[in-house]
Amino acid sequence: MYAVFQSGGKQHRVAPGHTVRLEKLEVATGSTVEFDQVLLIADGEKVHVGAPLVAGGKVVAEVVSHGRGEKVTIVKFRRRKHHDKKLGHRQWFTEVKITAINA
């Protein structure tokens, strides 16, 4: 059994027991989160595809941790002008473990 749900503007394909990094959620570590924007649920031969969402579909997950991703370096450079700028960015994320998929 697996599902595709939407969180933080991105789509994630998950199955029970999977651990996924999502955009930062303002939820305490150890608490339970329910995602109701489910786009697809597949259970063996039965596949429920939403138009655009599956009615009554829900993905339940437990928050494992919060953190920051790898540093992304941005370099801006103007040729022949002795001008360059270097910036860095680390995106916050929330790591969740999928506990159940409800159709």
UniProtKB/Swiss-Prot annotation:
InterPro entries with a match to the protein in the record: bL21-like (IPR028909), bL21-like_sf (IPR036164), Ribosomal_bL21 (IPR001787), Ribosomal_bL21_CS (IPR018258)
Coiled-coil regions, chain positions: none
SUPFAM superfamilies: L21p-like
GO biological process, alphabetically ordered: translation
GO cellular component: cytoplasm; ribonucleoprotein complex; ribosome
Keywords carried by this UniProt record: Ribonucleoprotein, Ribosomal protein, RNA-binding, rRNA-binding
UniProt signal peptide: none
GO molecular function: rRNA binding; structural constituent of ribosome
Family statement drawn from the similarity comment of this UniProt entry: Belongs to the bacterial ribosomal protein bL21 family.
Oligomeric and partner information: Part of the 50S ribosomal subunit. Contacts protein L20.
Function summary: This protein binds to 23S rRNA in the presence of protein L20.
Protein name stated in the entry: Large ribosomal subunit protein bL21
Annotated organism of origin: Shewanella oneidensis (strain ATCC 700550 / JCM 31522 / CIP 106686 / LMG 19005 / NCIMB 14063 / MR-1)
Gene name of the encoded protein: rplU
